[in-house]
């Protein structure tokens, strides 16, 4: 399979984030009227958080020291806090040709593996789950409605994770990252293609997600959500970004007009 075939760097490939699908679902299904919180021995925050998986996986990568810069936006409406797309996307940051190629190759591999038709690469589906982020250190919990973009389901309607891996990239590094994403989507099966430097798939393999210890990532996510809830005012925004020198997160109150510049909101 040649992942370079059909690639055009002049075509913008921006798929809708999972948060976009989640908004549509909530609006059409009267979602929150059917939502019941689970109170137990953990002190649960007063807010319900709504986000796409991207937000949580970016924080998880930060706890592993992956130097992948991001800046996300949180917006509060009454007792619901929406955490959406990377703030840098709002200013329409120009992607490098290499970044565009990485996006294209991943989308094309998923389409070729499922429908065989990669004419519409931005057509995706989402799975929505209620996740409780528990911090045992602070005895606190956060309710999160998380939307994950998925490309395939098995015969039991369970989501399947599909990825592309560079042939010289460590499998153990990849499986840890993929497994955290699978944990959020509820998937246990991962299908991945191994590509060479010319973007040709040399092998397709299947594995299961591993139950590795994600406590440091979950604690960091809990701390981020706690700080957002503490800082954010009703109908206001807070931006969050990592500081790789201090190994901590930075928070900034920003003007709500940022939201109006993004098609994702």
Locations of regions flagged by a protein language model:
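Accessory terminal regions of nucleic-acid processing enzymes
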Residues: 1-265
């Amino acid at each position: 399979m040649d992942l370079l075939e059909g690639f055009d760097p002049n075509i913008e490939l921006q798929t809708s984030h999972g948060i976009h699908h989640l908004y549509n679902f909530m609006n059409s299904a009267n979602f929150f009227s059917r939502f019941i919180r689970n109170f137990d021995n953990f002190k649960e925050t007063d807010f319900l958080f709504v986000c796409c998986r991207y937000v949580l996986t970016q924080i998880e990568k930060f706890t592993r020291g992956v130097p992948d810069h991001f800046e996300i936006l949180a917006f509060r409406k009454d007792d619901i806090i929406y955490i959406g797309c990377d703030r840098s996307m709002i200013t329409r940051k120009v992607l490098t040709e290499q970044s565009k190629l990485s996006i294209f190759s991943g989308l094309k591999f998923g389409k070729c593996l499922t429908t065989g038709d990669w004419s519409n690469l931005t057509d995706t589906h989402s799975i929505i789950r209620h996740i409780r982020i528990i911090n045992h250190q602070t005895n606190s919990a956060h309710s999160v409605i998380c939307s994950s973009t998925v490309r395939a389901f098995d015969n039991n309607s369970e989501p399947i994770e599909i990825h592309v891996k560079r042939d010289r990239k460590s499998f153990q590094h990849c499986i840890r990252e993929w497994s955290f994403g699978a944990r959020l989507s509820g998937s246990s099966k991962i299908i991945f293609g191994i590509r060479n430097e010319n973007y040709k798939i040399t092998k397709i393999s299947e594995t299961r997600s591993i139950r590795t210890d994600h406590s440091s990532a979950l604690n960091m996510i809990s701390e981020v959500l706690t700080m957002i809830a503490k800082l954010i005012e009703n109908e206001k925004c807070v931006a969050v970004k990592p500081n790789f020198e201090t190994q901590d997160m930075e928070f900034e109150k920003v003007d709500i007009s940022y939201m109006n510049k993004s098609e994702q909101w």
